[in-house]
Amino acid sequence: MTDTLDTTAPSVTYADGQGSSDVTVAVIGAGGKMGQRVSNNLAKSSYTTLYSEASPAGVELIESLGRSVTPTDEAVAAADVVILAVPDVVLGTVSEQVVPAMKSGAVILTLDPAAAYAGLLADRDDIHYAVAHPCHPSVFLERTTKEEWADTFGGVAAPQEV
């Protein structure tokens, strides 16, 4: 996995009506608890968003919101950013299916830092990996000291809003 900043990765802005329609985001697990939260925020942005869901109940929910469901393989192949909003226990398996189908230079974002830390994600040198959990916004806040930057798992050094 790469851990350096690559300025060629798609630019990402806040989901407050901003964003670029040139950036396509795929939400895998869009009908689940976390997928709904992520999808609802992306729906407020200008990003092209593709919603993928395996469960019939999740598909029904997505469609009830007026959103179309895209098959996972199609969503992943088209996406600049792939968000894995799936249960932690299947994250490794889903990443093994998704990562090989991603575009070179795309970003994969998981909502579980433990899976990445444990090396459970499929590895590919030509994509970028990121982790951000909606309940742990400290990774998005300004950090100034070396200790704050090193504290990405919710310890005491990083600023906390939760």
Please give the residue ranges for each predicted region.
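Rossmann-fold NAD(P) dinucleotide-binding segment
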Residues: 76-120
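Short acidic low-complexity segments
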Residues: 66-79
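NAD(P)-binding Rossmann-fold cofactor-contacting core
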Residues: 44-65
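Rossmann-fold dinucleotide-binding core
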Residues: 111-162
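Conserved glycine-rich cofactor-binding loop
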Residues: 31
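N-terminal Rossmann-fold NAD(P) dinucleotide-binding loop
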Residues: 35-36
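A short, basic/flexible loop-to-alpha-helix module at the beginning of a structural domain
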Residues: 2-21
